[in-house]
Swiss-Prot record:
Encoding gene, per UniProt annotation: arsA2
Name of the protein this chain belongs to: Putative arsenical pump-driving ATPase 2
Function: Anion-transporting ATPase. Catalyzes the extrusion of arsenite.
Family per record: Belongs to the arsA ATPase family.
Enzyme class: translocase
Species: Aquifex aeolicus (strain VF5)
Keywords: Arsenical resistance, ATP-binding, Nucleotide-binding, Translocase
PANTHER family assigned: ARSENICAL PUMP-DRIVING ATPASE ARSENITE-TRANSLOCATING ATPASE, ATPASE GET3
Length: 299
């Protein structure tokens, strides 16, 4: 099993590219799970289908949009369940206020998405040949990478917490809450396995358009991916204009585009580049995605 991540600036077509890639793999007879961590839930739009939870779109393709709100509720419930096994009621009330504050703090989305994505990838590794992940815009993707990178410290804290649970229960004379301890153990092993998959079985497609802002954001993204040791499979340069447009406006746009195509080529010399022409029509629906997928490589 391999995992392919698609990321980039909002509006460059990463959801279209990731969906078309998943369709292409599934049409080759591979079992594919397409996941979206983007709160915008764009998969429903691109497939022109109302996705309810997990949806099987063909014999080989399953699609799921991770619901951040639902995952946050489950995450909160788990934390309280663990806390109930170790803390007094007065402390629990204080903890409840702290958790509600944390839900609105920066970075909580990255933690919750990491939790949800780790379950999908680790638990279902043997069900699929490929898992394709349509990520949220670049900032969220980098937050996820930082979470993976800091995994060692996080796991160490979990182990310490487990030891404290034992000590608290011994002091109070109560029996250890097995469910809480099992949850800590499961989480530790799952995060470790997810980290291994990210570094050993994952590849990243960076999607951009030949313009200044997407180019600059892609530079930051690719440099961060290299810093974290994640392999960049290719750059997908989307919405490339025809070579010799007749319209004066398009001619001017083409000159700007040529400049950034050259900059992309020079800056990312060691990375494969895939150029996709600007499409005449919106790429919406399974058949359109299948047609669009001819521009993309196989896994």
């Amino acid at each position: 099993m391999r995992v392919f991540f698609f990321g980039g600036k909002g509006g460059v077509g990463k959801t279209t590219a990731s969906s078309a890639f998943a369709v292409k793999l599934s049409e080759q007879g591979k079992k594919v799970l397409l996941l979206s961590t983007d709160p915008a839930h764009s998969l429903s739009d691109v497939f022109n289908t109302e996705l309810q939870g997990e949806t099987k779109l063909s014999e080989n393709l399953t699609v799921k949009e991770i619901d951040l709100n639902e995952e946050l509720k489950e995450y909160r419930s788990r934390v309280f369940k663990l806390a109930e096994a170790t803390l007094r009621k007065e402390t629990l009330r204080e903890l409840e206020g702290i958790i509600h504050s944390l839900e609105e703090s920066p970075g909580i989305e990255d933690v919750v998405i990491f939790e949800a994505l780790s379950k999908e990838v680790v638990y279902r590794e043997n069900e699929y040949d490929y898992i394709v992940v349509d990520t949220a815009p670049t900032g969220h993707t980098l937050g996820l990478l930082k979470t993976v990178r800091n995994l060692g410290n996080f796991l160490e804290e979990i182990v310490k917490l487990k030891e404290k649970v034992y000590e608290l229960k011994k002091l109070s004379g109560k029996s250890v809450h097995e469910e809480a301890l099992e949850y800590l153990k499961e989480r530790k092993e799952r995060f470790k396995k997810f980290s291994e998959i990210i570094y050993d079985k994952s590849y990243f497609f960076a999607v951009l358009t030949p313009e200044k802002l997407p180019f600059e954001e892609t530079k930051r993204l690719v440099n961060s991916l290299k810093h974290y040791g994640i392999r960049v499979k290719a750059l997908i340069i989307n919405k490339v204009l025809p070579e010799n447009p007749q319209d004066e406006f398009l001619k001017a746009r083409k000159e700007v585009e040529k400049k950034f195509l050259k900059e992309i080529e020079n800056y990312f010399m060691d990375i494969e580049k895939i150029s996709i022409p600007y499409q005449k029509e919106e790429v919406v629906g399974y058949e359109k995605l299948k047609e669009f997928s001819k521009f993309l490589p196989l896994g």
